């Protein structure tokens, strides 16, 4: 009996080891630990990457040169970062393509409570994350819409902080006077009885951005098609699972963001799963086109370019034709 039990244990171990060896490795980076990353976390926690034959290593690399360098070198195969950085890099010759989105962002321009009107922002300092990021472009576009010339009427300070909640704390420390924040940042500030002034809603200003995007090297998409498809299938199923199974999404928020406050979790779920995530996370072509138009004056390589030049939708189109999204609907429809 003991021998039989030992053999059984060994066989189970070997089976698991063989299964693990059959999974293909994939390195995926994302820029910051924010609620918008929830599809990656659900896919990881629910075993969806393994379902589609992948052993995925999730890595945090701040948006900017480090992230672009990691994608260019092949250290990561999938990059979760603002599409503007990918687009600019591609325009300058790197073989990158935007392949998906984390959904639209809902940015607000918030200021220190001592600043009570938009005009009082003149001569002050607005904090961004890093140069060349979506936050910088969106901030500057908002300031122009509000009648300011960035760099002249208002100082722009790169804080180096991709997380908007951390930039908000820098604002309360007096190092900056305003920054872009998300709805859950506002909720958190309210919970802590921290006052602030809401100066503008970027959507109301007609400024639309993505929360972040998914990008890959074009040669990877061709030569490693199975891995690229597996990733996007797991990513998409995570979205469907998160919308249909609230408890699964909340479990990932708790684990990855170390958040246990019920009210905060509800806010995260509403803002980043229900309101933001599209069931078919195609690249946001209109947003990318707007970025091109706004960046052409500072990035001459973008002149004459269209959003389609920086997008690869072929895997999603294949999945559509194969009935993948119909299967998701049949599986997760309530």
How would you name each of these model-derived features?
Residues 4-17:
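Bacterial N-terminal signal peptides
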Residues 21-183, 198-208:
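Short, glycine-/small- and polar/acidic-enriched structural segments
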Residues 293-334:
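Conserved C-terminal helix/tail region of periplasmic/extracytoplasmic solute-binding proteins
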Residues 57, 65, 155-158, 267-273, ...:
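Short linear loop/turn motifs
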Residues 134-152, 233-266, 311, 318-319, ...:
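Ligand-binding clefts/hinges and TM-proximal coupling segments of bilobed small-molecule sensing domains
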Residues 84-85, 163-258:
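Pocket-lining segment of extracytoplasmic ligand-binding domains
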Residues 222-304:
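Secondary-structure end/capping motifs
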